[in-house]
């Protein structure tokens, strides 16, 4: 069973230490609920990932662990076969001992769009909400973050993250917790909170923004990336059924409305730093994610529309600062 003891130890003398009052029981319950299903099989795969300390580790410019020269061809093929058990790999890419995991998403492109605009992560305690397999967490660590915590309820994403971490070395100050944000208390402790690709999946986007705010210290920075549509501060799209074949998309605001939501939730210094239409080169099927992808979600006769006739995916990144709490909003 995946252990969280090293995380408990790392936060015992940090700004997150009061989380220890509730977190062990919550994760203990999660472990009991996942004794069956695919998780035990995946954990057996993780236990086979015993490899020499990597001669190269780079999280600054990519996520690269090992040059590829340390393993024989047979060892590398064995590692590739083990990593393939965790398909589909959606967020990446990763270079692991010479194995190039070409994921569905070029998450490095998103990171390069975002990182020039955020406050430096050096020595900051960072939370990544809806972190997926953790690609951006490693890049946050590469920017010098003191602690990086990612939360996502998916057991598969957790195992993908753990596979990378075991190859990188378990002593890294980076941890994945299989939780949704609604399971977190109001920690008021993180210097930076990222929520990228989550808001449009939430039935109540305002509640989600409040939950994000509750994790930040006063003066902390929110990095919020989500799907948007064109329009003014009165514009929002709620799909009648599916959007891009997804049945869990609820609200797509305009940039102006999104900024209004943040202002209403008592954030300050609110600014849009990037708007980008998702390209077919950024999200596509690969051997590591052989299922349907963006091209299958768009109108084959007009890629500016989804198959349902809505505007094709466009993503905005908003940065904002947590203000002093307004008692009228609590």
UniProtKB/Swiss-Prot annotation:
CDD domains in UniProt: AdoMet_MTases (cd02440)
Residues at which carboxy-S-adenosyl-L-methionine binds: 91, 105, 110, 130, 152-154, 181-182, 196, 200, 315
Name listed for the protein in its UniProt record: tRNA U34 carboxymethyltransferase
Subunit structure: Homotetramer.
EC number: 2.5.1.-
Record-annotated membrane-spanning stretches: none
Species name: Shewanella halifaxensis (strain HAW-EB4)
Enzyme class, UniProt record, top EC level: transferase
HAMAP family (alphabetical): tRNA_carboxymethyltr_CmoB
Keywords, comma-separated and alphabetical: Transferase, tRNA processing
One GO BP: tRNA wobble uridine modification
Role summary: Catalyzes carboxymethyl transfer from carboxy-S-adenosyl-L-methionine (Cx-SAM) to 5-hydroxyuridine (ho5U) to form 5-carboxymethoxyuridine (cmo5U) at position 34 in tRNAs.
Family according to the record: Belongs to the class I-like SAM-binding methyltransferase superfamily. CmoB family.
Recorded superkingdom: Bacteria
GO molecular function: methyltransferase activity; transferase activity, transferring alkyl or aryl (other than methyl) groups
NCBIfam families: PRK15068.1, tRNA 5-methoxyuridine(34)/uridine 5-oxyacetic acid(34) synthase CmoB
InterPro entries for the chain: CmoB, Mo5U34_MeTrfas-like, SAM-dependent_MTases_sf
């Amino acid at each position: 069973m995946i252990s969280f003891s090293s995380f408990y130890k790392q936060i015992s003398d940090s700004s997150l230490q009061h989380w220890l009052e509730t977190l062990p029981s919550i994760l203990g319950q999660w472990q009991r609920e996942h004794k069956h299903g695919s998780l035990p099989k995946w954990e057996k795969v993780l236990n086979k990932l015993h490899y020499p300390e990597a001669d190269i580790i780079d999280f600054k410019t990519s996520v690269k662990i090992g040059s590829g020269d340390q393993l024989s061809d047979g060892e590398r093929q064995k590692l590739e076969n083990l990593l393939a058990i965790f398909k589909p790999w959606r967020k990446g890419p990763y270079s692991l001992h010479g194995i190039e995991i070409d994921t569905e998403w070029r998450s490095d492109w998103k990171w390069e769009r975002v990182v020039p605009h955020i406050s430096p992560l050096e020595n900051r305690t960072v939370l990544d909400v809806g972190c997926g397999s953790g690609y951006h967490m490693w890049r946050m660590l590469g920017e010098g973050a003191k602690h990086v915590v990612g939360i996502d309820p998916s057991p598969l994403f957790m195992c993908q993250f753990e596979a990378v971490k075991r190859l990188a070395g378990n002593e890294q100050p980076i941890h994945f917790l299989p939780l949704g944000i609604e399971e977190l208390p109001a920690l008021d402790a993180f210097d930076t909170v990222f929520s990228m690709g989550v808001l449009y999946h939430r039935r109540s986007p305002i509640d989600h923004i409040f939950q994000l705010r509750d994790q930040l210290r006063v003066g902390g920075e929110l990095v919020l990336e989500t799907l948007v549509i064109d329009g003014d501060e009165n514009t929002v799209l709620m799909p009648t059924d599916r959007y891009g074949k997804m049945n869990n998309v609820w609200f797509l605001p305009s940039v102006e409305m999104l900024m209004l939501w943040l202002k209403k939730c008592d954030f300050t210094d609110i600014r849009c730093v990037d708007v980008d239409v998702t390209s077919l080169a950024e999200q596509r099927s690969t051997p590591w994610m052989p299922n349907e992808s963006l091209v299958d979600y768009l109108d084959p006769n007009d890629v500016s529309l989804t198959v349902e006739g809505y505007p094709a995916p466009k993503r905005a990144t908003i940065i904002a600062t947590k203000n002093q709490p307004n008692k009228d909003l609590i």
